[in-house]
Amino acid sequence: LCPNVAILDPTLVTGLPRHITIGTGMDALTHAIESVVNPSGNPITVGLGLQAVRMIRDSLPRVVADGSDLCARQDMLVASTLGGLALGPGLGMAHCYAHTIGMLLGVHHGTGCGIALPAAMRFNREHASARLAEVARAMGVETAGMSGVEAADAAADAVEALMKAIGHPTRISEIVTQERILENFEQIVAGTMSDERTGDQLRLEHLP
């Protein structure tokens, strides 16, 4: 889909329910971070993605706390658009997982992305440490003195901290029963691995 116009009017989304605000916000953050670490990324997509990360870091907690905050809503709309513009190189494993559990378990797409994002970042940390270090700094982490892998881990930790601060689940078991997860486990793995976006992963050759 390639729209001709994007209407970024914060007054249109002030009534968005809190859980939708949280889920769509995490989807936007996932777009941004996956664009930054994608091996096919370029200076334009990386720059757009990092700016989106910075804006979401600052604005998402504000819109969750006060949905009528027009400045924060506006910043989230702009950040989401920047993340969309950065998607040219492709997405990543968090989206593969979200597509699958959305279909099999009915999990909101953005929520599925958010749950998978920190794990996907850690999975790729050795092969994307430099880009993930940039994400860490965009999330407000002071990375001076850290190794690349330490900075990558700090980026994932910062994302998890944001999720907890806004009331977003960090584990699928928080919103789906263990029984349903186990019943669908093989399909979840197969669906995630067969998603066309899995090819964007840096460590695909190391997957079991």
Regions from the language model: what does each represent?
Residues G15-R18, A86, Q201:
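A generic structural signal for short coil/turn motifs at secondary-structure boundaries
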Residues I22-G25, R73, C113, F185:
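Short runs of predominantly hydrophobic/aromatic residues within well-ordered alpha helices
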Residues L132, A136-P208:
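C-terminal charged capping/lid subdomain of soluble metabolic enzymes
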Residues S35-A158:
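Active-site segments that bind and position negatively charged phosphate/pyrophosphate groups
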Residues L1-G41, R131-A138:
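A glycine/threonine-rich phosphate-anchoring loop and its flanking beta-alpha core
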Residues I7, G25, A32, M93, ...:
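Alpha-helical architecture
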